[in-house]
Structures are given as C-alpha cells and as structure tokens.
Amino acid sequence: VNGQVNKIVRFILLGSLLLSAGAAQKQSTRGQPAANDAYKLVAVKVKGTSRYTDQEILAASGLQIGQPAGDGDFKEAVRRLGDSGMFSEVLYSYTASGTGVKIELQLADTADTKLVPARFENFVWFSDSELLKELQTRVPLFKQLLPLSGNLLDRVSEALQALLTEKHLPGRVDFLREEDESADTLSALVYRLEEVSIRIQGVEFPGASPDLTPLLTVAARRLIGAEYTRSALAAAVKFDLLPVYLRRGYLKAAFAPSDARVLPAATTGEQGPADIEVDAIVPVTPGKVYSTSSVNWKGISAITAIELAPLLHMPPGQPADEVRLHQDLENVTKLYRSRGYMTAQVKSEAQFDDEKSTVHYDLNVAEGDLYKMGELEITGLDTQAKARLEAAWTLHQGQPYDADYPKKFQEDTGSLLPRGIRWAVTVHESLDAKDKTVDVEIHFKQQ
C-alpha cells in the first residue's frame, strides 16, 4: 500500500528448546519474506524481562541498529539468547517496511531458583567491581548469577581468559561447581586460575583494633606461604579468625570477603613468570562488646538446672564468650547421652539489648526419649578373649544406656586382651528408634 510492504514473522522458543541449540523451532509462515531478504534494523523493543535492559538484550543478541538484518539474523539472535540459559521462553516478531525492520522480543526470565551466584577465587589483580564491569561489557547477560544449564558460564570463562591475555597476566581460567553439602544442591559456580602459583606473603586486617591485631595475626599464621584462594580464607575466617572476636564478646563481628594486593615481582631470578606473591586483605567490622545479662534453661526435666550449672561458664556482667558457650553445650549434650538420652539436642537463642550492650541466652533443650542398653556384640577376638570381655561388660540389657561407658570399658579392659598384639578398636552404636534401645558392636583388629 502506497509503495510500502509490511511483513510480519513470529518465532517462539520455549523452555525445552533451550536445552539444545539444534532443537526444532516453531515458526509461523504468515507473510514470511524470503530467507535472504534483509532490511536495515531501525528499532528493537524488549518485553517480559525484569532482569535486563533493552540495550543489554540488544548487545547479547548480536543485532545492531542501523545494520541490515534478515530472517537468518533474527534466528541467530534468538539462538544466542536461548542458548544462554537465562530465559525460559523467547518469542519475537518483526515488521519490515520500506524504512527498515522493527523487531520485538518477548522474553521470560529463568526463575531465580534455577540460578546460582558466580564467585571468583584468585583473580588477585582485580577487585570484584572491576571484574563485574569488565564481564558485563564482554558478556552483557552476566549479572553475577549463572544458570544451571546453557552456555553463559562458558562465555564468562572465555571473557575472563581474554581479559588475562589482554593484560598479559598468567593463568588458565577454569571453573568448578560448588555444592551445598547440607542440601545436596549446587550453591555456586567458582571461577579460578590454574597453572599459576599465588602465595600469601602476609595478612592484613583493616578495621581491627591494635589490641586484637596481634591475636588475629597469630590465628592466621597457617595462611602464610599457602596458596591464595578466597575459599581458604573464608574457612580461616570461620574457624580461626572469627573465634578471636566471639571469645571476647564481639558477638556481631563480621568479616568482608577477602581481597589481595599483588606484591612486586622478585628480581633475584628465583621466581618464574607465573609465581605471584600477595598480601591477603581481610576487612573486619568488630561491632560492640556484649556482656551476659542472664541465662535461662528451657525444656529440661530429666536433669536439673542445678546439675547443669557447673557445665556453663557464662557469668553475668562478663563479656559473653560464644566459643566457650558452644563447648559448654556440647558437654551438656554428652551429659544427657551418659544418662541414656541419646537424641538430646541443645540450642542457644541470643536476645540482644543494644542500648545496654548485653545479651540474654535461652538454652533450649530437646531431651528426647530415654534409650536403654540392647545387645552387645564383640568381634575380631578369639573365643576366650571374647568371653572375658563379655563378662567384664557391666552395662546390662534394659539398663539406661551410658554413651560414656564404651570408652571407659576399653580403658579398663586392656589387660584382658591377648598380649603382644596392638589392637585397633572401633565402637558402633545402633539406635532402635522403635524399641528405644542401643545395640553396641565392638570390633577389634590387629595392627
């Protein structure tokens, strides 16, 4: 009409098609131009995504405003978006006229539950913000989250390798899948450098007070000379550094993710080009010191508060030592197990008063059922030695079980074993939740 030709083509890519670039594509043929028709791309409109801007989608698609674009280009753009794994659905339509072609993309974002965060282990020359900026320029769909399927993780890996090459930096980029052991699910995708040695020369603690810095330095001593990885530093924070604060009442102390400062290369010739030394930087926000105001037991009946009191070391008015509290509660659990309460659990619940800088603890005890001694089985010994040990076992069937007894039994009966032989002893306790009994197997093995 009036010398103008309007043509509309639709293309749909559903979630199942994302799994295979070669999957069949559904396409309508209404008014479809010839496959080699090309028009100047004059506009791109994006709908349906809350994760990306129009500019990011355009960059990821490979299309360019002002350049010729035809049916094959649009199919390739859809393939690029679909193969990334960041969309569960891609639909597009375009209108071609004498002035050019306008394309509309209708997208459905992949659910957040199907994405995991990306982490960077040892890219010591870059901060997280610098890496993110570089990657978003090179991989427009990357925003610190990666899909469980699709090729986006490979695109990120390639971009990181290209960045290293451009900067003349050593290392080969690899990635691994990190699992959450408690949930048996993928928790992160971790990018790291291989074929390069990055060693920790020193550790700094920005934010730490002068009186605690020496204690942190001692706690971090095993890191000196170790390979620099953020996961190793995170483990050191959890098990070595944070307890320095928790022992002294800094109950809200927090460590930020570690960074690194690359040190000047050695000039002695002893280092190769792929040997890097760094100072690890572990920022800390100590917070305030909390003193214990009071402690309250809840859920106890089998053991009295008077019996439990000697096991607890949280004096009112003194800085709350959560490391000691954890140890104390483990001892409380052991006491319950020695009385036959084999499934007893004790959990602390802290209630903070920030104005007074105090903390109250509720110690919640789930005692569980009383278990009694079941059957005893001794294996690995000759008949006579087995008979001697069975006679020495005084925890009889039907009596409340004592989880401390097997260890004491081993200590007291060593003289009953055949002489001249070193024995490895393993004790296995089997709980019968229905009958509330504990069967004990003691196995002896010659070393």
Residue ranges of predicted features:
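A composition/secondary-structure signal for short, hydrophobic, low-basic-content segments
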Residues: 6, 21-23, 28
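Periplasmic polypeptide-binding modules associated with outer-membrane biogenesis and secretion
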Residues: 25-447
